[in-house]
């Protein structure tokens, strides 16, 4: 349980990955800084959720190759 994310987290993550595909990697800390730089997020919690989802998607993308 707990792995279902809100729609705005998913849509923001997909938009960021579409616009900036080479900016993100599988490191959460680096992704957190990039999300804060590239997106206007209201709270630290939302920023961390987006960065975590970006990290998860990038890690799974690396495993698929």
From Swiss-Prot:
InterPro entries: Ribosomal_eS17, Ribosomal_eS17_CS, Ribosomal_eS17_sf
Keywords attached to this entry: Ribonucleoprotein, Ribosomal protein
One GO BP: translation
GO CC field: cytosol; ribonucleoprotein complex; ribosome
Superkingdom field: Archaea
Alphabetical list of PROSITE patterns matching this protein: RIBOSOMAL_S17E
GO molecular function, one term: structural constituent of ribosome
Family the entry assigns: Belongs to the eukaryotic ribosomal protein eS17 family.
The protein's name in its UniProt record: Small ribosomal subunit protein eS17
Organism: Methanocella arvoryzae (strain DSM 22066 / NBRC 105507 / MRE50)
Gene that encodes it: rps17e
